[in-house]
């Protein structure tokens, strides 16, 4: 959560939070990882670009793509759709041509052993998220909580947002709560970045912001709650792929 974020004016990149907030209450994101056969990445990207341009344009079902640059899934693709109501997934109507094309892409390019990366559903939490910027990269951090610790940690995220607001810190991040697809005691912080330079430590630090907003006693109490509640966390850096993504509405 201590990444330095800078706003950018490059409109070619997708502003995720703009999509989410523009649609008001639809907050559900569905996503998965795709492990492409080695040497087939360029062909896969070309095929997905064609697929998205035909079936996932403005006014159609949105689809966005990133490529993972760090961790055990380096080189895999992160593909998702967001800004939905739950019932949208029941009511969506696809064509046989669309479904066959996506099946063709999967059969031709995706590794049969796809790393167990099944579909997951996440619920965007605007009350925990902070700021709004477009981004060419994201730092996707998942926090896996111990039993009965999730609510307490999300309460800390509320105060963390307030501390950032009081400090007027120049960061941008979205918070999602996991709803389905594996263990549910999980939330994610999706930090919006320009590049790796935004991973550098910030001033004031998280502790300094928190203490300034709530005092040392609250910081120490919440730090202990966070430490006790966190089972483990993992951060993946991803680059946005505009050609593999729906065009954002103005």
Residue ranges of predicted features:
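Positively charged n-region of N-terminal signal peptides that target proteins for export
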Residues: 1-8
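Hydrophobic h-region of N-terminal signal peptides that target proteins for export
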Residues: 14-22
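Short S/T/G/P-rich N-terminal loop/turn motif that feeds into the first structured element of a domain
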Residues: 22-250
């Amino acid at each position: 959560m201590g990444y330095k974020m800078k706003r950018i004016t490059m409109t070619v990149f997708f502003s995720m939070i703009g999509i989410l907030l523009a649609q008001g209450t639809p907050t559900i994101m569905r996503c998965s990882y795709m492990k492409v056969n080695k040497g087939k990445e360029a062909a896969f990207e070309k095929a997905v670009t064609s697929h998205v341009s035909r079936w996932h344009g403005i006014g159609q079902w949105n689809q966005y793509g990133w490529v993972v640059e760090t961790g055990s899934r380096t080189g895999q693709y992160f593909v998702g759709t967001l800004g939905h109501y739950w019932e949208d997934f029941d009511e969506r109507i696809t064509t046989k041509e669309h479904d066959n094309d996506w099946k063709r892409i999967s059969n031709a390019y995706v590794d049969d052993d796809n790393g167990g990366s099944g579909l997951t559903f996440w619920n965007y939490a605007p009350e925990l998220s902070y700021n709004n910027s477009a981004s060419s990269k994201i730092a996707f951090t998942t926090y896996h909580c111990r039993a009965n610790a999730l609510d307490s940690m999300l309460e800390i995220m509320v105060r963390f947002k307030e501390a950032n607001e009081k400090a007027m810190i120049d960061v941008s991040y979205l918070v999602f709560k996991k709803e389905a697809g594996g263990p549910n005691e999980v939330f994610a912080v999706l930090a919006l970045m320009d590049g790796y330079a935004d991973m550098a430590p910030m001033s004031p630090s998280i502790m300094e912001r928190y203490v300034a907003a709530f005092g040392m006693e609250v910081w120490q109490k919440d730090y202990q709650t966070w430490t006790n509640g966190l089972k483990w966390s993992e951060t993946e850096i991803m680059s946005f792929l505009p050609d593999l993504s729906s065009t954002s509405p103005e």
